[in-house]
Design a protein with these regions (language model features):
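Ribonuclease/tRNase effector modules and their secretory precursors
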Residues: 1-106
Length: 106
């Protein structure tokens, strides 16, 4: 099974999500607002899929905020009652391509 961006967007829109402690800490230290998480998911795409992640199936979403800030959101599949936001960050051009959708091989 793979995650559906439409299902994730719907759950985010319906307030059916929660942040892990790690994601809360990262959002504070990286100055990423909940509004920006919502915007990046609404405008984003799934760029990596982790169906066998040790804590449960998850995926990585890359999207832009309304201010065009790139944000990556690692979250659980929408099969859970609440989507878990696992971590989030602003991707770096040192590790990602120009549109932040593919990792750069070293």
């Amino acid at each position: 099974m793979t995650a559906s961006i439409e299902e994730i967007r719907q759950k985010i829109s319906d307030e059916q999500f929660e942040f892990s402690k790690h994601a809360v800490d990262q959002s504070i230290s990286r100055n990423i607002l909940v509004r920006e998480v919502r915007e990046s998911i609404a405008n984003g795409q799934i760029i990596e899929d982790y169906p066998d992640d040790k804590y449960g199936a998850s995926c990585l979403i890359s999207g832009l905020t309304e201010d065009k800030r790139p944000i990556h959101v690692h979250c659980s599949y929408p099969t859970r009652p609440l989507i878990k936001i696992i971590t989030l960050y602003e991707p770096s051009l040192q590790r990602w391509n120009d549109d932040f959708t593919q990792r750069i091989s070293n």
